[in-house]
Amino acid sequence: MSGFSLEKFNFVLLFPVLSLLFWAIVLLLLDAFKKLSRNFYIGASIIALFSTLCFLLIYNGFVLDNSHAFFDLFVSDNYAIFAQIVILVFSMLYLLMDKDEQKAEFFSLFLFMIASLILMISSTNLIVIFLALEGSSLALYTLIALRGTHNAISSSIKYFTLAAVGAGFFVFACAFVYLKTKSLDLDNLLHSEYISDPILLCAGVMFLVIVGVKLSIAPFHFWLKDVYYGVHTNFIAFISIVPKIAMIIVVLRIFSALGGGVKFEYIVALLAIFSMLAVSIVALIQKDVKKMLAYSSITHSSFILAVIVSSMSVSSQGDGTSYLLSIFALFVYWISFAFANYGIFLILSLFQKSSFESFSGLFDQRPVLSIMLAIFILCIAGIPPFGIFWGKILILASILNSGYYALVFAVALSSMIMLYAYLKILIYVFFKKAQIVESANLDVKQKIILCLCLIGSVSCVFLLL
């Protein structure tokens, strides 16, 4: 083949994926031949993640930036590189803060899932995105079910069933895109003469189903509450943050390609408004902190969807500066939420029960822990001067700049409704009559991570400047 060249493969770009897959296979084989301690598997997994992170930090801007691999099936741009770094950092934080006894295959599946997430955000080809999406999803279903309890298995099956329906819609959407454009590459779709075709609008609506499932946007969120109640508390923090980061990048790529001529952003805006308002009202009547936080994560995902609507609008207008503002607002908001969310669930993992009443009078018994919990709660509520407040200001500025005033009103109203739900737990912690609270103690690693989460949730916006 005269046109064949090894340079077109560009294996350097795929090193993060290949490295994590190698470590996943090694850990799986080690478990088959010799039973090793849990600490060994945690250490090996962290080494795998950290070495991949170092590679990204060292080679960013030298080899990876705006380069392609495997005949343009994979791309490495600034958004993908930054998202990969965030995924690796919060994956390591999860492994360090988790004290639950996990089986050896858990860590192999965990690395396989992270590799699939990185692959998903590194491609602009719909088939590659779909394969990586399903690879990460299959690993996640299994990780949820590995706990072995009835709740864990049933929630995993419910998630699998709903996601399988979403995957079917994704395949149909890909078929529609190929039918009209004769291409499955999103870069080609951006410059397609068929961008205003109604068939592509139908494809966008079908894509929206899998997006709703993966980002847990109402009315595709029914699996989330069961998962929150069925898995280990620290793992809840992970699945509510890390898999969604990869999906957010995919949504940005797909919706930016579809938002040029069919005014697809109107449909996405309506879904975001419905999701954030409906779920905020449901969150008010919850009697369990975990379930309330499940609905809280849905509202935050809806806010992210609102930013994506803004980015779609300004991207179709060719306003590069406003588009960058939208992306910056998205990352500031989600990273601030990630730190605060990790902190909250790390504290919740110390308690056997998660009802509001079980936290009554916690301040009288553990004042420092109560104050830290209050800071994290106020952070996700968007109270100044915490990081999410600045992220939400950037979100509102971005949406205003794109002209979606109804979306701005919906974000503000949803935030006010959720504020009451957040303050409810603080009322129990600080003002309710004290009762005996059964709780464990933080080890040294968890104390360090809790402090890091506190710093990150308060000052994230300044760290990113």
From Swiss-Prot:
Keywords: Cell inner membrane, Cell membrane, Membrane, NAD, Quinone, Translocase, Transmembrane, Transmembrane helix, Transport, Ubiquinone. The keyword Magnesium does not apply. One of its GO terms (cellular component) is plasma membrane. InterPro entries: NADH-Q_OxRdtase_suN/2, ND/Mrp_TM. The keyword Repeat does not apply. It is a multi-pass membrane protein. It is an enzyme of class 7 (translocase). It catalyses: a quinone + NADH + 5 H(+)(in) = a quinol + NAD(+) + 4 H(+)(out). One of its GO terms (molecular function) is quinone binding. Its EC number is 7.1.1.-. NDH-1 is composed of 14 different subunits. Subunits NuoA, H, J, K, L, M, N constitute the membrane sector of the complex. HAMAP family: NDH1_NuoN_1. Belongs to the complex I subunit 2 family. This is NADH-quinone oxidoreductase subunit N. It comes from Campylobacter lari (strain RM2100 / D67 / ATCC BAA-1060).
